[in-house]
């Protein structure tokens, strides 16, 4: 897996600009709603470039948007030339999740590139770093100087969306990197919206149990290098740190630096770092915000993050995104990361041919799986496997399983299989009282709802007592003959056939 290497976000932007994948906007544009309007239908959905707003109204700091607005740029950020190469990233993760010892000298030789990449997993700690070129603290901290965007008309307040939140639990050696949105509620205060099962929230819960009443250290990095950003959204094994995975992607060790006010380590090349703490028991109502579902979410309480220090580069760039009804930037990330999931699932379930998370299904709420079916009831086993194997699919409400003659990424094929190979009573699996996304207001209880599996495979003996239909297939000899005379027929030409 030969990777393109970027030392920092600016290296990546330079390459994007050279390839026509970055557009600089010099016209003053307001971060309040206007950037989203330029970005949404007019740029992202048209497959347009990353946007660098150099003169956001009221601010001296540029705003970077749409960085991962096409699958190609996601692949480039992971060091690959195109999306298809992301399967190799998935194979590497599958190997790291369940490494297999070499079966012999030849196998050892074949695995040497994977073992060599492991050398890039440890971080490299620096004494000084670009992200600490400027430091403000105490009363000088003012988050209002950062051009934090307001994306939708009914959003409660400006919202940080691409912050890499760094935490460490009291019993863990490695740090956790997670991306959680953060609502601005004061010059030095943000609401940290993390769900209870996410790594940062788990670290906080463990800290509260181990250190009652003590402040929980938190740091947030904005504008890290692309490998570190994407490492935070990729399904890395629980035993692998996001920094280690970023080193694998980049092909060089991730450079980190100790924070000014706590012992957490942040990406040395980040544009901006927010340092501070969460006071146990301090919460605030968060939202509403327009979300990836296409709706405003309900208001709920989350911990308050108090910022004590802001460190940054000279001439820092603020990196932002928005969420809305797909396609949005997270949906584009989902399309690309879909290719990473396939090899991970195939290692556990070799019968899986393809796996697809349609972006219109919010990128995770519906999955289509195609398999080489081997026995009666096989489809139901695969459904249960998808729901339980990776925590990324904990909130997948619908799983459709089809045979390998169906294209999982073609709705015409999938709907044909559902309507011709399913009996609703026999082939529908309903599971009640399962974990559901807090943002899913369709569930009867917040965080708890049902799941549905659809077995759209051909039925085997034991699954049906009827003679099963045989798909219509063309005669290959006739097809070859018509191919040979097709041009002579001139059916789509104005002239007459010969």
From Swiss-Prot:
Q: Which cofactor does it need?
A: prenylated FMN; Mn(2+)
Q: Which SUPFAM superfamilies match?
A: FMN-binding split barrel, UbiD C-terminal domain-like
Q: In which pathway does it act?
A: Cofactor biosynthesis; ubiquinone biosynthesis
Which is an annotated Pfam family here?
Answer: UbiD
User: Signal peptide position in this chain?
Assistant: none
From what superkingdom does this record's organism come? Bacteria
Q: Which UniProt keywords apply?
A: Cell membrane, Decarboxylase, Flavoprotein, FMN, Lyase, Manganese, Membrane, Metal-binding, Ubiquinone biosynthesis
Q: Which GO terms describe its biological process?
A: ubiquinone biosynthetic process
Catalysed reaction(s) here are:
a 4-hydroxy-3-(all-trans-polyprenyl)benzoate + H(+) = a 2-(all-trans-polyprenyl)phenol + CO2
Q: What is its EC number?
A: 4.1.1.98
> What residues does Mn(2+) bind to?
176, 242
Query: Membrane topology for this entry?
Result: Peripheral membrane protein
NCBIfam families cross-referenced by the UniProt entry: PRK10922.1 (NF008175), UbiD family decarboxylase (TIGR00148)
| Role | Catalyzes the decarboxylation of 3-octaprenyl-4-hydroxy benzoate to 2-octaprenylphenol, an intermediate step in ubiquinone biosynthesis.
Its assembly, as annotated, is:
Homohexamer.
Q: Could you tell me what this protein is called?
A: 3-octaprenyl-4-hydroxybenzoate carboxy-lyase
Source species: Escherichia coli O6:K15:H31 (strain 536 / UPEC)
Name the gene behind this protein: ubiD
